[in-house]
Amino acid sequence: MIEFVYPHTHLVAGVDEVGRGPLVGAVVTAAVILDPARPIAGLNDSKKLSEKRRLALCEEIKEKALSWSLGRAEPYEIDELNILHATMLAMQRAVAGLHIAPEYVLIDGNRCPKLPMPSMAVVKGDSRVPEISAASILAKVTRDAEMAALDIVFPQYGFAQHKGYPTAFHLEKLAEYGATEHHRRSFGPVKRALGLAS
């Protein structure tokens, strides 16, 4: 990992999101405060890890972290607020869910939600900051499991494979079967499938 200079505080939370781009399902966020006395080897951006490694690390993070929490914004909230504001809301919910209040919050990306403690956005933080890497893993494992569960209910869409992203297969099935109640109606391809696009 590229070296990152930490703020001079003890309780640092990392926050990341998964699911801004998909056409279906919630945007899922996680906040994690790691325990310096219980290091976790192999933390990295969740997208760079195999599914098997992510699942193993997810359990280790939950066991060893001082505190962890998940947040989310549902499709109807994404449609009402837009994806950026819904993501910020989901991040606020993840931080609020921590049972230990962090002294500082590091957030993946280039924007910070309004929080009751100091925070900083870190570009490519999921590869540079272990707390953000841990949050990225928790959020991805959680959202992938939700897509696998949705795939059982709606097998024709292939959610377990594409995780709701606008692949050619997903767009084809959206045109063929229409949108489910879990689709984001404000997203262009879903609007078009519902005949709502002008």
From Swiss-Prot:
GO molecular function: manganese ion binding; RNA binding; RNA-DNA hybrid ribonuclease activity
Cofactor note: Manganese or magnesium. Binds 1 divalent metal ion per monomer in the absence of substrate. May bind a second metal ion after substrate binding.
Pfam families per UniProt: RNase_HII (PF01351)
GO biological process: DNA replication, removal of RNA primer; mismatch repair
InterPro entries the UniProt entry points to: RNase_HII, RNase_HII/HIII, RNase_HII/HIII_dom, RNaseH-like_sf, RNaseH_sf
EC number: 3.1.26.4
Reactions performed catalytically: Endonucleolytic cleavage to 5'-phosphomonoester
Assigned protein family: Belongs to the RNase HII family.
The protein, known as: Ribonuclease HII
